[in-house]
């Protein structure tokens, strides 16, 4: 996947970030990893770009019910309603893992496959 570069946008310039995202077609996340255990899958799409210095990622989620019980960062946010983003910057087998709950609690990691 190629990530579009849009230079000159600061992450704290909400209007510019929103305008950039508005010009990007959302891509669906049409994957249910454990359909036998969890047959319900929310509607999820994402948009992404980078500025050269920053990676900007926006998820849009429509979910029937939400859970937000984990209140600390680096807690078990995967047990709540959350989105996950994994990125490998090279072929070393290492990757970054970002998970964010619907209330903004984060789980961050750097792992090897």
Regions found by a protein language model. Name each.
Residues 1-113:
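Structural preference for beta-rich elements and adjacent junctions enriched in aromatics
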């Amino acid at each position: 996947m190629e990530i579009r570069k849009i230079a000159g946008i600061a992450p704290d310039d909400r209007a510019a970030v929103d305008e950039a995202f508005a010009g990007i077609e959302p891509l669906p996340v049409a994957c249910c990893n454990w359909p036998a255990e969890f047959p319900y899958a929310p509607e999820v799409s994402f948009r992404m770009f980078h500025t050269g210095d920053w990676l900007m990622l926006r998820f849009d989620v429509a979910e029937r019910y939400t859970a937000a019980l984990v209140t600390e960062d680096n807690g078990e946010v995967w047990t709540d309603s959350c989105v996950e983003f994994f990125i490998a910057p090279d072929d070393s087998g290492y990757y970054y893992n970002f998970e964010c709950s619907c209330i903004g609690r984060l789980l961050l990691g750097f792992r090897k496959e």
